[in-house]
Curated annotation (Swiss-Prot):
It comes from the Bacteria. Residues 3-141 form the DAC domain. The gene is disA. InterPro entries: DisA, DisA/LigA_HHH, DisA_sf, DNA_integrity_DisA_N_sf, DNA_integrity_scan_DisA_link, DNA_integrity_scan_DisA_N, DNA_integrity_scanning_protein, RuvA_2-like. GO terms for molecular function: adenylate cyclase activity; ATP binding; diadenylate cyclase activity; DNA binding. The keyword Nucleotidyltransferase applies. This is DNA integrity scanning protein DisA. The keyword NAD does not apply. Its cofactor is Mg(2+). ATP binds at G70, L88, T101, R102, H103, R104, S105. The lineage of its organism: Bacteria, Bacillati, Actinomycetota, Actinomycetes, Mycobacteriales.
Amino acid sequence: MTRPTLRETVARLAPGTGLRDGLERILRGRTGALIVLGNDENVEAICDGGFALDVRYAPTRLRELAKMDGAVVLSTDGSRIVRANVQLVPDPSIATDESGTRHRSAERAAIQTGYPVISVSHSMNIVTVYVGGERHVVADSATILSRANQAIATLERYKIRLDEVSRQLSRAEIEDFVTLRDVLTVVQRLELVRRIGQVIDNDVVELGTDGRQLRLQLDELLGGNDNARELIVRDYHASPEQLSEAQMTATLDELDALSDTELLDFTALAKVFGYPTTTEAQDSAVSPRGYRALAGIPRLQFAHADLLVRSFGTLQNVLAASASDLQSIDGIGAMWARHVREGLSQLAESTITDSLS
């Protein structure tokens, strides 16, 4: 059975959920609590004493049961309270960095059973959730919103810079004057935007219903970013052949695996794309295959763009093709040929206009 991840568990504890309501009632009562979010034979094996309930979950019931010293065990889906006032007896040999008895039991139980375990400290009024070997302190919405709003401001600055370098790359593509450095600059900015977006997305998940406005802002700022990453990999990977889906995914995974320090190093980015890792190579000329440019043509499907790239090889060859040349490609009829030809002409004109403005 697949065990819940930390992200999934945090979403279950977000404002607007029944579990969060119960936790807030416990915090206000300052009684503390130990709650296991799942039940099977592994959980039963570490439970001692207490009593079976098997009643429907309700925040008020959780609050009342938490007044007792023992732990509360919920069903795996969280819909029922299975047991209450039980003593958790996990394997004491499991390593833990916690000092309090409740927190040590929670961490060990989470590791041993694979289910999330929540510990509520009555003295510090803090909720901590343990998932496997991970530990997460649940913050209040005001704290998360303050942090997320600062991150949104940073993301907006990153997005402005990304748009600038993307326009510069598009202009260089039309003029056939692209260097590897131009490409890596855009790749770097795309990745920076994606990473800070992930941080904010985690905050949005933790905010639950309190993060709706933040979700709208994030979606607007990140719209098309993942697609742009895929297109630039297809356009500029050093492979002499068109990338397969597996190769493209592997390249994106390599980008994901770069540390923040490596992301600032163009030689590390060049290596991911299959280019030499020398500084001199960054000023070498490269030619796009044309996926990015063709994606800018309204209503043009990827399948049609892929046909054109595989037939003509480079963007410059596509730009030089007439409507009849485009129509000669199997799968590209007269209507699409005219549409592509007009779209490329408009793209070139708008790019030149932007460079003059």
